[in-house]
A protein has these predicted regions:
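Basic side chains
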Residues: 6, 89, 159-160
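Low-complexity, intrinsically disordered Gly/Pro/Thr-rich segments
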Residues: 156-165
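N-terminal domain-onset segments
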Residues: 18-94, 98-150, 164-187
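Bacterial Sec-dependent signal peptides at the C-terminal "C-region" and cleavage site
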Residues: 2-21
């Protein structure tokens, strides 16, 4: 177990064992995020620990109709030649009807299986769940309190990260915009 995971365990235990729920802090939330390679998995843990919904399943709602230009050097970051298709998803991740994050995800379609690409193109399944069999890791590139570029108003925490395959090849570049719903008291 990595050091980030060890740091997150006491936070999760305190949240699960507490009888009256204190308000969550951004520091606690960030510890849980840092302990997982997938924001989807971290949000699922957080939703369950905070009891934000009776069924702590994370669901993605694809936001269609909006095209967002990628950062200028993204093809270089993802190590993609000019003719390779880059996938893009803009989603809201929710737990029990509470929107926990809005995310922009640019990814190397050639590094996913055809079935994974089809699932991403045709369903609302979260990227982290679809790509989990690839055992990717997460390299945090930056974060800030509040809204970063690409994030909507009301964002309380923003992260930028690069997801890498076990061989080090870049899989995806993500911008994650976390909402105040993560800090809400349970229902």
């Amino acid at each position: 177990m990595g050091s980030d995971a060890r740091l997150a365990l006491p936070v999760l235990a305190a949240l699960l064992l507490g009888t009256s729920e204190p308000p969550a802090t951004l520091d606690q939330f960030e510890q849980v995020l840092a302990a997982q390679p997938s924001a989807t998995a971290a949000l699922g843990q957080w939703c369950a620990a905070r009891r934000l919904a009776p069924d702590p399943q994370i669901r993605a709602a694809v936001i269609s109709g909006r095209t967002t230009d990628p950062p200028g050097d993204l093809r270089r970051i993802l190590d993609l030649s000019g003719d390779v298709r880059m996938g893009y998803r803009h989603v809201r991740l929710s737990c029990g009807g509470k929107v926990l994050s809005e995310a922009h995800n640019w990814y190397a379609t050639e590094r996913l299986t055809p079935e994974m690409n089809r699932t991403l193109d045709e369903t609302d399944t979260p990227f982290g769940r679809v790509a989990a069999p690839l055992r990717f890791t997460r390299e945090r590139l930056g974060g800030e309190r509040g809204a970063a570029s690409y994030c909507p108003r009301g964002t309380v925490l923003s992260h930028r990260a690069l997801l890498r395959l076990p061989d080090g090849a870049p899989l995806a570049y993500v911008v994650e915009c976390y909402t105040a719903q993560n800090l809400a008291r349970p229902d």
